[in-house]
Amino acid sequence: TICTGADRPCAACCPCCPGTSCQGPEPNGVSYCRND
């Protein structure tokens, strides 16, 4: 399956890649996958 890499916006289609998790929202209102 396709996963969302670190420092990319969290996408409903695709979980964050292993070792990262969805964090946010940031000041721009977007949540990003970040390294754990």
From Swiss-Prot:
Site (Important for the neurotoxic activity): I2, V30
UniProt entry tagged with the keyword Ribosomal protein: no
Coiled coil spans: none
Disulfide bonds, paired cysteine numbers: C3-C17, C10-C22, C13-C14, C16-C33
PROSITE patterns noted in UniProt: J_ACTX
Keyword terms: Calcium-activated potassium channel impairing toxin, Disulfide bond, Ion channel impairing toxin, Knottin, Neurotoxin, Potassium channel impairing toxin, Secreted, Toxin
Predominant location: secreted
Pfam families (alphabetical): Toxin_16
GO CC field: extracellular region
Tissues showing expression: Expressed by the venom gland.
Site (Critical for the neurotoxic activity): R8, P9, C13, C14, Y32
Family: Belongs to the neurotoxin 11 (kappa toxin) family.
Function: This excitatory toxin inhibits insect calcium-activated potassium (KCa) channels (Slo-type).
Protein name stated in the entry: Lambda-hexatoxin-Hv1b
Native source organism of the sequence: Hadronyche versuta
